[in-house]
């Protein structure tokens, strides 16, 4: 397939001439658009069919380029919506506990959240062990999705010792995060983290607006105030939108 420079699409004219696999040339073209600022964060990337039409390459070539750029964290593919330029990855300190709303604000971005569940449950064996309470004792449960500039970046699945925070269910967590409230009523003195790489459940993929099979980063966190367990949380992040960072010295 040949075309003159006058009838090439604007995107096709950005393709490099250096010999390389076609998918690699498509990737480099998209990266150049992002790095130049022509496609800023949240910019909608042309669909596969649009790129096939504009670049003259096969759908398989375009799909591979988009898939690899998503895996690299440069693009975000949202089911039923489209593909968008990703924000630079959010990061959290590996062994510190911070308010996710503050982390997002520190990056100059907007935080909001959606409360999916907020209620009371009876502690079964697993919850009782995690919170150091008796089986059958009441505990509070909240399930919240946190957004950074309207892109879901974390599912916070949290169980709380009701005896420590009896007014937990009365809070408006669209105005302050559970972390912010709990640090007021039961200041953190000790924490425990377990970090895993997992595949999210289908319902979690829907909440995070990711495709099934996308790797996720899971942080299991327990915190104490004095010698009393306050909360046990499961924090799930899309791997393409989050990273952990730590530093140590000897």
UniProtKB/Swiss-Prot annotation:
Q: Which GO terms describe its biological process?
A: L-histidine catabolic process to glutamate and formamide; L-histidine catabolic process to glutamate and formate; negative regulation of DNA-templated transcription
Q: Which InterPro entries match?
A: Bact_HTH_transcr_reg (IPR050679), Chorismate_lyase_/UTRA_dom_sf (IPR028978), His_ut_repres (IPR010248), Tscrpt_reg_HTH_GntR (IPR000524), UTRA (IPR011663), WH-like_DNA-bd_sf (IPR036388), WH_DNA-bd_sf (IPR036390)
Q: Which GO terms describe its molecular function?
A: DNA binding; DNA-binding transcription factor activity
Which keywords annotate this record? DNA-binding, Histidine metabolism, Repressor, Transcription, Transcription regulation
Q: Which SUPFAM superfamilies match?
A: Chorismate lyase-like (SSF64288), Winged helix' DNA-binding domain (SSF46785)
Q: Report the function annotation for this chain.
A: Repressor which binds to the hutP region in the histidine utilization (hut) operon. It blocks the expression of all the hut genes in the absence of inducer.
Write the protein's name. Histidine utilization repressor
DNA-binding region(s): which residue ranges? 48-67
Q: Does the keyword DNA-binding apply?
A: yes
| KW Repressor (keyword) present | yes
Per the record, the pathway is: Amino-acid degradation; L-histidine degradation into L-glutamate [regulation]
Domain HTH gntR-type, first and last residues per copy: 20-88
Per the record, the domain of life is Bacteria
Question: Could you tell me which NCBIfam families the record lists for this protein?
Answer: his_ut_repres
């Amino acid at each position: 397939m040949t075309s003159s420079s006058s009838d090439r699409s604007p995107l096709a004219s950005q393709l490099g001439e250096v010999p390389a696999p076609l998918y690699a040339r498509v990737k480099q073209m998209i990266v150049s658009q992002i790095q130049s600022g022509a496609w800023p964060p949240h910019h909608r990337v042309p669909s596969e069919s649009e790129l096939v039409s504009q670049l003259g390459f096969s759908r398989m070539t375009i799909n591979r380029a988009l898939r690899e750029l998503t895996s690299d964290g440069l693009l975000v593919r949202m089911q039923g919506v489209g593909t968008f330029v990703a924000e630079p990855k959010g990061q959290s300190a590996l062994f510190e506990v911070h308010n996710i709303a503050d982390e997002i604000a520190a990056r100059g971005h907007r935080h909001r959240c959606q409360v999916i569940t907020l209620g009371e449950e009876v502690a079964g064996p697993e919850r009782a062990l995690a919170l150091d309470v008796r089986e059958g004792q009441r505990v509070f449960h909240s399930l919240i999705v946190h957004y950074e500039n309207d892109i879901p970046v974390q599912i916070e699945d949290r169980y709380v010792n009701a005896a420590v925070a009896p007014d937990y269910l009365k809070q408006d967590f669209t105005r302050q995060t559970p972390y912010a409230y709990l640090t007021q009523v039961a200041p953190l003195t000790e924490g425990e983290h377990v970090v895993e790489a997992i595949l999210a459940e289908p319902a979690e993929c829907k909440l995070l607006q990711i495709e099934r099979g996308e790797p996720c980063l899971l942080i299991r966190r327990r915190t104490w105030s004095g010698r009393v367990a306050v909360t046990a949380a499961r924090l799930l992040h899309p791997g393409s939108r989050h990273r952990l960072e730590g530093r140590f010295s000897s």
